Amino acid sequence: MATKLPTTDIRIGAELIRRRKGGVPLVCLTAYTYPVARLLDPHVDLLLVGDSVSMVLHGHATTLGASLGMMIAHGQAVMRGSARACVVVDMPAGSYEDSAAQAVASARRIVDETGCQAVKLEGGVDMAGQIAAIAAAGIPVMGHIGLLPQSVEKDGGYKIKGRTDETVAALMADARAVEKAGAFSVVIEGTIEAVAADITRRIAIPTIGIGASGDCDGQILVIDDMVGLTVDRVPKFVKEYADLRSVIANAAERYAAEVRDRTFPGPSHVFSGSKASSDLNGGDES
């Protein structure tokens, strides 16, 4: 059954997300394309145009392959494909770290060129100034603490956070700094479960967990991981709700066989002369 085109602006805004603290868990997924946004929009509260797009769709080894132009292009596609979900666009590495002024300029460009509801950036105490400046400019901003994909090269890989008293204290400081700076919510990624749960209890803005805790105020996964489309190793925290790898591989195998034995295209997939509909997409022949 075809998904209806979005026709009415009934967007969930950042303020509504903020008010969901402690309520029914927020449902969040990444989206990078128009058709996927259309399919997900009726079921989620928030769509994140994550810089993971550089890995998932563009084949880069890390999220550092994302550029501002790339994020804007995918943000535009997701906005076109959705009508209800709050759309948040990641600020890629290199677009905000240098100064508050740089962060505001990049955030404003993202919002102006996509129409998205908010932006997201990585970092806690060290990025509080950037978060505060973006929020002061009237642009809703989501924080991101814990495992920071943009810092994996500096950190020596994807390391779980919160294993020592020192790192637990640092995570709590990051969460409080993000909250105080004016973020409307914060992603907590790749932490010890009890630490994420404690942070959730101690701060007043919603926490969105990914490899964190079921006690977070919401959960997010990369869409390709969730539907079983990821072709490389899938993180432990992912639950696959479908197996699109097999669906696509089997469809390609069947298509190849039918092309080679000339059973495709069949009579119903070609135009039969004067009685053919003039509509390329089909229609009754008369």
From Swiss-Prot:
Q: Where is the active site?
A: E189 (proton acceptor)
Which reactions does this protein catalyse?
3-methyl-2-oxobutanoate + (6R)-5,10-methylene-5,6,7,8-tetrahydrofolate + H2O = 2-dehydropantoate + (6S)-5,6,7,8-tetrahydrofolate
The cofactors it requires, by name, are: Mg(2+)
Compartments, as annotated in UniProt: Cytoplasm
- Pathway terms, separated by semicolons: Cofactor biosynthesis; (R)-pantothenate biosynthesis; (R)-pantoate from 3-methyl-2-oxobutanoate: step 1/2
Region described as Disordered: 263-286
**What EC number(s) does its UniProt record assign?**
2.1.2.11
Main EC class of this protein?
transferase
The superkingdom of the source organism is Bacteria
Question: For 3-methyl-2-oxobutanoate, which residues are the binding ones?
Answer: D51, S52, D90, K120
Give the signal peptide range: none
Q: Which CDD domains match?
A: KPHMT-like (cd06557)
Broad class of the protein's primary localization:
cytoplasm
The record's remark on the cofactor is:
Binds 1 Mg(2+) ion per subunit.
Q: Which UniProt keywords apply?
A: Cytoplasm, Magnesium, Metal-binding, Pantothenate biosynthesis, Transferase
Q: Which Gene3D superfamilies does the annotation name?
A: Phosphoenolpyruvate-binding domains (3.20.20.60)
Q: Which GO terms describe its cellular component?
A: cytoplasm
| Biological process terms in GO annotation | pantothenate biosynthetic process
InterPro entries noted in UniProt: Pantoate_hydroxy_MeTrfase (IPR003700), Pyrv/PenolPyrv_kinase-like_dom (IPR015813), Pyrv_kinase-like_dom_sf (IPR040442)
* Residues where Mg(2+) binds: D51, D90, E122
Mention one GO molecular function: 3-methyl-2-oxobutanoate hydroxymethyltransferase activity
The similarity comment for this entry is:
Belongs to the PanB family.
Q: How does it assemble?
A: Homodecamer; pentamer of dimers.
Q: What does this protein do?
A: Catalyzes the reversible reaction in which hydroxymethyl group from 5,10-methylenetetrahydrofolate is transferred onto alpha-ketoisovalerate to form ketopantoate.
| Annotated protein name in UniProt | 3-methyl-2-oxobutanoate hydroxymethyltransferase
Q: Which gene encodes it?
A: panB
